[in-house]
């Protein structure tokens, strides 16, 4: 119906005399209100997170503590010899977390603040999208358009409650410092840039947007090649579709697609000198023979997530959002909606389709690769909401107007008081939640070490939280099931010249042979909460463990040229 309706007439504004300072103050107040609303939503998300089992994934998972471990390594002046995954985390994860940890004391607090910054960053990008899609709308309307999808994502996050990483509870996973929040923000951030590149009022604006696209693609792909699948290829496909439908001329269509593809290529080439920091090359993910397994995995993941009432609500919302985005994009193309509306809708739809096809076609089995299914519909909601408001007067015969300034001031005052009270309560709740208190097991280990110069060893999922939350005396090396060193999301510098005298175990510690069979009986056994410490100091087990780790680490370091 929307494309059949006439555009709303441009509103006739009658301005009372006001100084430039007063207008600037009003504009700033509106923008700050949007940020404050986003912060309140973020506090709601994080309050729920720290009280649910998701706190385990957020605070203590082996992957989730990567940024605290990197920050500690930099703070202690270690050489940067980190073995990352295919993701380098150089833009923006490491700089952002290090900056936050510099001013925010404690790992728990730094991770929470980082999550809040991530939500505000997402709002800022959506606010920019609203500004270029419906530039003539009032600030209040554009702020509301950007806040609405953030509120919808907040609702989804409140439905997420399990302590498992491998589910489709991706909104809370997005808030961690490890699971691709930077790539997700870059993907959404490409949308306002492509709108300006195609529909900018001046040639300078269009050229600036193209430069921005190249820079964004290069930086994002350098850090995480997933950006090419999530954004670069979808933009190129969308540009082609709009050109075929005569919604774009050839020049901007080619320029947009080329900007992102060239930027992605530049970013990928820039990764070549960083090869020694990359543990897994892209070819490792090309498992076409696992397509059937991939389909089963994602279908099972969907229904497993939907097996509780909270998950059923979230998965229903996801299904509606994804199918709605795809349907609206098709309608926009078919009905020749304005380019500034059609282009971001089609890019969002292409991102969803390309992501699903690539995830299955490459035989992947990782839910985090499906982030576009949550965040591209959120961006599409801004675009469709703006277009609906633009056409609403023709649909209803009524002009949609904001209430009078007096009513708005009173409503804002009430909202500020309510949000402030709720925010204070949320901060207190997070500060006193069990999940944010001192990690007792790490404290126990630190107390047992007692300042001695000791080094331990443990499996990836066992030892990383102890290292992140322990004091500087806690140094634990990662080992495989065969008691050999493993370089994966850790610093090779840790393995140099270490005598390994204790082993950390928990319920997730699985070895090919028991520690007693390989290392002999420990000198003593210490229990620290869920962990068991086998102390081999002064025994033959210390020599055996040290030798195996030293030899295997030296081989891996030489192989990686670290």
Language model features: what each stretch is:
Residues 207-225, 233-236:
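Membrane-interface alpha helices of multi-pass inner-membrane proteins
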Residues 31-38, 211, 261-262, 388-428:
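Signature aromatic-anchored transmembrane alpha helix within multi-pass, membrane-resident enzymes
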Residues 178-186, 229-230, 310-320, 342-346, ...:
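Hydrophobic/aromatic-rich transmembrane helices and adjacent perimembrane loops
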Residues 66-72, 83-109, 290-305:
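Short hydrophobic/aromatic helix or loop-helix immediately within or flanking a transmembrane segment
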Residues 202-206, 243-255, 322-350, 361-363:
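Membrane-interface helix-loop-helix junctions at transmembrane boundaries of multi-pass membrane enzymes
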Residues 40, 113-146, 152-154, 189:
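Transmembrane-helix motifs of polytopic, lipid-linked glycan transferases
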Residues 450-487:
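Short periplasmic/luminal acceptor-recognition loop of GT-C membrane glycosyltransferases, typified by
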Residues 60, 137-198, 365-377, 460-461:
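Membrane-interface micro-motifs in multi-pass membrane enzymes
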